[in-house]
Amino acid sequence: MKKYLKHAGADVSASIVVLLVALPLCLGIALGSGAPLFSGIIAGVVGGIVIGALSGSQLSVSGPAAGLTVIVATAITKLQVYEAFLLAVVIGGLLQVILGFLKAGVIGDYVPNAVIKGMLAAIGLILILKQFPHLIGYDTDFEGDESFIQSNDQNTFTAMFEAIKYITPTALVIGVLSILLMIFWESKFIKTKKSLKLFPGALMVVLVGTIVNEYLRLSGSSYALEQKHLVTLPVAESAGAFFSFFTFPDIQFLKNPDVWMSGITLAIVASLETLLAIEAADKLDPLKRVTPTNRELKAQGIGNMVSGMIGGLPLTSVVVRTSANISAGAKSKMSTILHGSMMLLCVMFVPMILNKIPLCSLAAVLIFTGYKLAKVSLFKEFYVKGWNQFIPFVATIIAILFTDLLIGILVGICVALFFLIRSNFRSAVMVVNDDHNYLIRFRKDVSFLNKPIVKKKLEEVPKNSFVIIDAERADFIDKDVIEEVNNFLCHAHLKKIRVEVKTGQNKSTKNIFSIPQITEE
């Protein structure tokens, strides 16, 4: 407990920032999923408190994810009854716990670094592009939408141009003022003032935006922002009304195969998104701590079971909230737990105050977070590393921008695999010749993709040559390649080619070639 109290100041400050970022995202994702608004809040609270406590990650923040929006909306429509969907969420959570015990968390280790960094940069760009309309008061799409094709039938870019046609002057002024304040709060001047450092920039932005709009409203100005441009939390008039927001799964739907299919789909997609987000969180962590991924799957599974049992949306670890948490200076998991606790207290006791916060102020916070994720220096870093790193990095960004997170990641992995295979293809077989003396050396892993080049080089060996086939440095040689070499060995004497074979003591390559015994006639 002492290690958490040691950084209490930083964690409390960061938790406020995460709360301000998470609230509209929870509501927006619930709206975009076609679920009750309060289901997003439930998921946010459970993600903060339950998963925050059980997770081995010190900085990851869980909550309802934009990447599950389409899956959730489809499942709710297909199942028709929300209680049946909640049962699917519980089943999905149970399957995640099982995946954790089966040690499926290792999957995340196979995603290349260029793809993970590309995902982070893409999310940063998405935040900037998607929040721009909210910054200037065009709030037609729900908060947290990350897909290229939006729920209002526009795409990321057309929405920006459309937003310019319908600028809300007050939102524009507050939004620009908020960004300038965020930049100022990052300056050396603020960092040298201990008293000001205690207040996170995001909190100051929200306070200034709220005060400006409240002043306009109380003075009767027509420039005051309407409620559609503000946070909109469900408000309960009594304790009974508050508890009526909770919904419970109906076990009679266990017989419905669609419930099970929805649960399996949620488990697979939520687990993949979580593992990717955890990889990203570990790379963003200044202390480079490593999260136990199997424990994370178990924590996510328990969180999803709890969320589904009380009416909440499915959960994953979320990069946007995590990056906001790290950017705000969080040091431990107390920040995550505190943000969930404060969210619960806020919706219980002060929802009417939170409903005065302008969305344009929160958009400024998210845009600034996006900028930190997609800095120009990151692009330069991968460009310097070479094309085999830069192209998968850029491909991941472009694919995520024009599709969604999971499809973009898969595209990035495929591009990275192409460069890996290409590199291995080039280095696996080396051919050197001096007059009629040939050296054919196999290195690393020689796959079936190397068969054409091996076949071609062996066929090109002229009569009366001397050939050394060296497999001492090979870890693996595909059977198709072995067959080609054996075929060459079998017929080499017909062209009066002398062959020496070296296989070394490696068990995987020793005695793999059939050296014929040729007798002189």
Locations of regions flagged by a protein language model:
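Membrane-helix interface "capping/anchor" motifs
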Residues: 53-63, 188-194, 327-333, 377-384
